């Protein structure tokens, strides 16, 4: 994006918001949520579903908040692992691969790499390439999973929902942490975090976090290696003006594996045998995934005397990805697999900008908490692609060291996307009633430029997204709600003729109930929903062109319980039922269920802290995850076997024996070392689940 164009867009948006502020004369403070005095709410607060801090009990949408304490206790080393005990989510789409954070929401896998947000701004990955971004959980404060369409506030997004990440911010109380860890598969690493004020007046605070991690992947000899650093600074310019600066520098010089194997040989025997779940079908000299991510951004906010506030968020990112992969391409004979080659070099730059104005006004007995916003996204990705072939490999007795039969340049492209959105939200409160209305208008431009063949395709579209929701707060902590919302997802995918596909559109009806016992520390929720999406971009095999296949419908039920059963016992439990099927498609796919979408999922995590006695400081925890009803392909030829995984943690706070700030923890995931296939894209590409992982860590907090 040219600098002058970006400056023009930013200035135009700032002027529009500034003009709105000039006419604002409302007296109420924007950050306070109005509640009836007789309703006592101790609800956790979310902002992903509304862009404003709102108690979850007052939010007429399914939201799960995964705290740092939760995902650290469970030993999560990626965002997808951190949400694995969350309803409505399937985070095992590619099994043991840790390269990307694939997160399937309410059965929708398309765009699952592009529904992640950091500090309110889209991560801006390109799903039509290998340039998909990740943030290590070490740098996160919490994770919100917002289920259902969110286009009314965010524009293009999956109808299944979004994942909203919140980074760790500078604190004016000095402190820090150092952590060392090691485990099986040669896992090892270190992390640190330090924060505190930089001046005596506590106007400026800084934070610096960093980590490194290394491991042999499940598919030897591939490795996983990561280095990341996040500096941030908070400046209280005045009592009413605050500036937050942040940067994120991330390097994965080794990205592990990301490949599948045939259904025959993984799920069921082939020629009387099964392939090992550690089998590597590639060539070490030719398999490589190297990702560099650099982000820098700011958030500036000002509170006016009349209680209204204005804020601007901006983030710029630049990524560079190199991919070389030798992959299996079906059985050649009784023991050997054909092999192909895929290579890519990519450079991507993107800007995400969001301007917001919010405040409150009363109209009679109704309080309106208003949010007006203008956001802008611009992404450009330059890609060069190669394909080729390698000699076959024996899947049961592999011999490595082969050279390619050929490698050929097949594409040199530029993918461009630009989105400008104007949105309005009104959160109304009247007695115990809560009404939410929202609308958004988007202008979206998508271009695919084929430099190799000197051609291009363009798509310019406008879209209107809406939301309407109603919730009632009973004084016993029960809150039933009903909502309607829409979604749209413009794409850079093209058909076999090079034409960019039409944006996917979705609509959802959702009904649910939330319950928070007064005076307690528990949250319970239940939701039923139906989502219909049209113009879906998909392909049946990796080499096939993308196409629009019509309409898909997802219906489901989600249950969640988060409870502190006592001062020592914590419970997290969830159940998900998902029925997602093609409603309008080819005759072969009509009525069939989508891949990557389990019919049933259930999970529970229970932990216990010993508060007194000889074992004071000890934490014991265990979790169980059950998955059932994953189909093998789009024709539903087979259903994968159900699987159950057991996880556990043992922690010890050594402060109880006088070693203040020191703690130790042991995490074991897949305790029984279950061999299973997590999902299949087709009968040609199925993905082994992760084997047992054992990691011990020692931390010192100061």
From Swiss-Prot:
Protein name per the record: Ferrioxamine B receptor
Pfam families given in the database record: Plug, TonB_dep_Rec_b-barrel
Signal peptide: 1-30
Protein localization: Cell outer membrane
GO cellular component: cell outer membrane
Family (UniProt): Belongs to the TonB-dependent receptor family.
Bilayer topology: Multi-pass membrane protein
Function: Ferrioxamine binding and uptake, in association with the TonB protein. May play a role in intestinal colonization.
Residue intervals of the TBDR plug domain: 55-168
UniProt KW Transferase keyword: no
Keywords carried by this UniProt record: Cell outer membrane, Ion transport, Iron, Iron transport, Membrane, Receptor, Signal, TonB box, Transmembrane, Transmembrane beta strand, Transport
InterPro entries in the record: Plug_dom (IPR012910), Plug_dom_sf (IPR037066), TonB-dep_rcpt-like (IPR039426), TonB-dep_rcpt_b-brl (IPR000531), TonB_rcpt_b-brl_sf (IPR036942), TonB_sidphr_rcpt (IPR010105)
Span of domain TBDR beta-barrel: 173-702
Tagged with keyword RNA-binding: no
Gene Ontology molecular functions: siderophore uptake transmembrane transporter activity; signaling receptor activity
């Amino acid at each position: 994006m040219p600098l002058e164009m970006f400056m023009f867009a930013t200035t135009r948006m700032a002027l529009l918001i500034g003009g709105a502020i000039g006419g604002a004369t409302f007296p109420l403070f924007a950050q306070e949520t109005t509640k009836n005095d007789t309703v006592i709410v101790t609800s956790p607060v979310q902002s992903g579903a509304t862009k404003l801090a709102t108690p979850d009990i007052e939010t007429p949408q399914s939201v799960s908040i995964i705290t740092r304490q939760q995902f650290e206790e469970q030993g999560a080393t990626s965002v997808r692992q951190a949400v694995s005990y969350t309803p409505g989510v399937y985070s095992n789409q590619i099994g043991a691969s840790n390269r990307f954070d694939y997160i399937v929401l309410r059965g929708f896998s398309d765009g699952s790499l592009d529904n992640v947000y950091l500090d309110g701004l889209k991560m801006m990955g390109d799903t039509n390439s290998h340039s998909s971004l990740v943030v290590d959980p070490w740098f996160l404060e919490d994770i919100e999973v917002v289920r259902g369409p969110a286009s009314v506030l965010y524009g293009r997004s999956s109808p299944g929902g979004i994942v909203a990440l919140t980074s760790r911010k500078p604190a004016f109380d000095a402190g820090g942490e150092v952590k060392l860890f090691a485990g099986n598969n040669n896992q090892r690493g270190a992390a640190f975090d330090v924060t505190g004020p930089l001046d005596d007046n506590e106007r400026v605070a800084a934070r610096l976090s960093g980590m490194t991690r290394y491991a042999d992947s499940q598919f030897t000899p591939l490795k996983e290696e990561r280095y990341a650093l996040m500096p941030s600074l908070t400046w209280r310019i005045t009592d009413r003006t605050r500036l937050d600066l942040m940067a994120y520098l991330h390097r994965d010089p080794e990205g592990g594996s990301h490949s599948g194997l045939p259904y025959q040989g993984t799920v069921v025997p082939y020629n009387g045998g099964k392939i090992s779940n550690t089998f590597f079908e590639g060539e070490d000299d030719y398999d490589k995934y190297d990702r560099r991510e650099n982000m820098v951004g700011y958030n500036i906010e000002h509170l006016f005397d009349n209680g209204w506030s204005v804020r601007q968020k901006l983030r710029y990112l630049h990524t560079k990805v190199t991919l070389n992969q030798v992959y299996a391409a079906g059985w050649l004979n009784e023991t050997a697999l054909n092999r192909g080659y895929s290579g890519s070099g990519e450079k991507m730059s993107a800007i995400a900008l969001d301007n917001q104005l919010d405040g409150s006004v009363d109209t009679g007995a109704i309080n309106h908490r208003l949010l007006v916003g203008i956001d802008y996204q611009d992404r450009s990705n330059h890609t060069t692609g190669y394909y080729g072939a390698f000699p076959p490999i024996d899947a049961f007795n592999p011999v490595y060291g082969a050279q390619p039969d050929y490698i050929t340049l097949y594409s040199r492209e530029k993918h461009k996307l630009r989105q400008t959105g104007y949105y309005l939200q009104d959160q109304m409160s009247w007695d115990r009633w809560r009404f939410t209305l929202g609308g958004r208008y988007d202008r979206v431009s998508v271009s695919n430029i084929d430099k190799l063949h000197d051609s291009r395709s363009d798509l310019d579209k406008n879209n209107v997204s809406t939301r309407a929701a109603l919730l009632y707060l009973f004084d016993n902590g029960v809150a039933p709600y009903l909502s309607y919302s829409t979604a749209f997802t413009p794409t850079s995918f093209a058909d076999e003729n090079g034409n960019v596909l039409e944006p996917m559109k979705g609509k959802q009806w959702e009904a649910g109930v939330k319950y928070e016992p007064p005076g307690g520390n528990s949250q319970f929720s239940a939701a039923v929903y139906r989502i219909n999406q049209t113009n879906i971009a998909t392909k049946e095999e990796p080499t096939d062109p993308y196409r629009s296949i019509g309409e898909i419908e997802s219906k489901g039920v989600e249950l969640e319980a988060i409870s502190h059963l006592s001062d020592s016992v914590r419970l997290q439990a969830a159940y998900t039922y998902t029925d997602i099927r093609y409603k309008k498609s080819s005759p072969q796919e009509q009525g069939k269920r989508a891949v990557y979408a389990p019919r049933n999922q259930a999970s529970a995590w229970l932990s216990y802290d010993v508060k007194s006695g000889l074992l004071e400081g000890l934490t014991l925890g265990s979790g169980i995850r059950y998955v059932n009803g994953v189909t093998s392909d789009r024709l539903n030829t087979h259903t994968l076997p159900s699987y159950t995984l057991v996880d556990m943690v043992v922690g010890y706070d050594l402060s109880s024996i006088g070693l203040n700030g020191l703690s130790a923890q042991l995490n074991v995931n897949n305790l029984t070392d279950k061999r299973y296939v997590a999902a299949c894209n087709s009968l040609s590409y199925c993905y082994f689940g992760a084997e047992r992982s054992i990691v011990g860590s020692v931390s010192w907090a100061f």
